[in-house]
Amino acid sequence: MLKKKLSLEDEDDDRSYNLRSSRSNAKSKPRSSAGTATNPRASKRARLSGASATQEDSSLVDKIRLSFEDFDEALSGFKVSSGYERSKNTDLWVDKYRPRTLEELSVHKKKVDEVKLWFQESLDFLKNGLRNNVLLVTGQAGVGKSATIHLITSILGVTVHEWNAPIPTIWQEHVHNTSSGLKYTSKLDEFENFVESTRKYGVMASSSTDGIKAPVVLLIDDLPLANGRHAFERLQNCLLLLVKSTQIPTVILITDHNNADSSDQTARRMEDTQSSLERAGALKVAFNPITKNSIKKVLQRICREEHCKVTTMEIDQMATASGGDIRHAITSLQLFSVKPELNHTKIKSPRPGMEDNYHGNEQTMYSGLDSGISSCFGRDETLSLFHALGKFLHNKRETDNVIISECSSSLVHDEFARLPLKMDAPEKVLSQAHGQAGRVVDFLHENVLDFVSDGAIEDAWCVSSYLADADLLLADIRGKMSGHNNTEDVPQSAGASVAVRGVLYGNKQPCSSRWHVIRKPKLWQVEQSSIQTKKNLREQRNISYEGSRVADISVMATEYSPVLKWLSYRASPDAFPGMGEETDEEDSDISEDDEIQDW
């Protein structure tokens, strides 16, 4: 007992122990010879129970040391799968096989030449007087925007100063900084400070061994996230200021949103930002998605270098599932090569009801590959808003034989029976298209009559009835910003579902398949005009009454505005030369209408 107490006191005094040495000492200790099948958790409980009488600090030390012992015991029984034949190199293939020459770039040669020509002209603008210092490169993710810029600058010997986005602040760090008295600075604020310092002081050019300063290019690859209209206006003003005042060649990379998200406010605001930068003098070069054949060539080259056991059909399916994103395709290939036996098992198992013709039908094999690869490593299936609208408006259905076999035992009247649709459930299509309820209904209102046969008056009446019901469900969001108009709310989801299913159900005699142009809803123009008119009335009310709310907008529009216009005309008739004549013409028109009504 005395020895045990002395040993515990020694452990108490030794506060500066090394956890790594404790771990290695724990490994070197021999196992107990009491039995060959000793339970490690039982021994852990025994050791902990033996140390329960010690002081609190010694107990914590023992727990940490014993946790390392258990971790070592778990690692001793871990074995690497024999099916994993890859090397121990953990480098990402995206970085390992990045292009090092212009020939290795998968970007279209015309786009590369445009970027290279801009660099050559902007670097010697002092000779030819060019002042186009900003290049705007757009395109979806993984089309080689940054790779092209870095490769061309390295070939031309240009030093790239890149804007490095700050590390995001987690909530615990924010709480700690707030308690310490540090003020939180958003990423947008830091970007504005960076642009301001770049405008004022520029960037330092590095000198070569010969003492000649290398040309400098500023690269902005990761714009801060702007959430909301006010934040977007700040970001847009900051970029416009940079375009108008920068003295060094500047490249701004903007990643376009997917077409499936085209109905989002963020996508439209980014398009407005790009247009404003072009008007300010920036040169825009839009990168297209990488072609399927180019992606397949890159994947085949990587397979030869890495000795991957991937078939040509699998490479073709990966290239198709990438959607023009070469970075996504290379990452999918690397993930696919980690456990090839599991991936092949998933791919070779056809869907139910397809066993008979799976091996004989190549299209079925591709669908099996799609279900295997896309579910594991591919993107979630998405649709553009116009693709979804095309499915709803064209209303393609199966043949007559299907309805007889499936609905022969049902009690549905022939008048209400419909053929099965050649698509998924309408709600699933809406979710894949990220369609906002109000926008979907507006598009259907504007374009549905073009897809109804000329003599199908009852179909047009039925479709209009369902669309009216959808308008009733969506009445609360009319006139609001579309950022609050989403399909997550129950009334909006119900309204979108009623509108879509009403169009599909009511149009029994759709027009034959031909080219149709989807028109933009005219209602949007009316709403924008209404919003602008209300804004002008608010400004006029604030100016006239010094900000005091003396009248509602409707009262301003119906009473005060006509009176103010009439008073302005009485005060200075020359300012409104045609007002009196227009009034006389209006009176004559009204009198003629009255005569027609009396007759």
Swiss-Prot record:
Q: Name the InterPro entries for this protein.
A: Checkpoint_prot_Rad17_Rad24 (IPR004582), P-loop_NTPase (IPR027417), RFC_lid (IPR047854)
Task: Kindly list the cysteine pairs connected by disulfide bridges.
Answer: none
Regions of compositional bias (Acidic residues) in chain numbering: 581-599
A Gene Ontology MF term for this entry? ATP binding
Region described as Disordered: spans on this chain: 1-54, 575-599
Q: Which GO terms describe its cellular component?
A: nucleus
SUPFAM superfamilies, per this entry? P-loop containing nucleoside triphosphate hydrolases
**One GO term (biological process):** regulation of DNA repair
Polar residues bias locations: 18-41
Q: Does the keyword rRNA-binding apply?
A: no
Binding-site residues, ATP: 139-146
Keyword terms: ATP-binding, Cell cycle, DNA damage, Nucleotide-binding, Nucleus, Plant defense
Q: Where in the cell is it found?
A: Nucleus
Instruction: Report, from the record, the phenotype seen after gene disruption.
Output: Suppressor of sni1 mutation symptoms including the accumulation of DNA damage leading to a constitutively activated DNA damage responses (DDR) and increased basal expression of pathogenesis-related (PR) genes.
Show the PANTHER family listed in the entry. Answer: CELL CYCLE CHECKPOINT PROTEIN RAD17
What family does the entry list? Belongs to the rad17/RAD24 family.
Assembly description:
Interacts with SNI1.
What is its biological role?
A: Seems to be involved in regulation of DNA repair correlated to non-homologous double strand breaks (DSBs) repair. In vitro, involved in rapid but not in slow DSB repair mechanism. Required for effective immune responses that involve activation of DNA damage responses.
Q: What is this protein called?
A: Cell cycle checkpoint protein RAD17
State the species of origin.
Answer: Arabidopsis thaliana (Mouse-ear cress)
Point out the gene that encodes the protein: RAD17
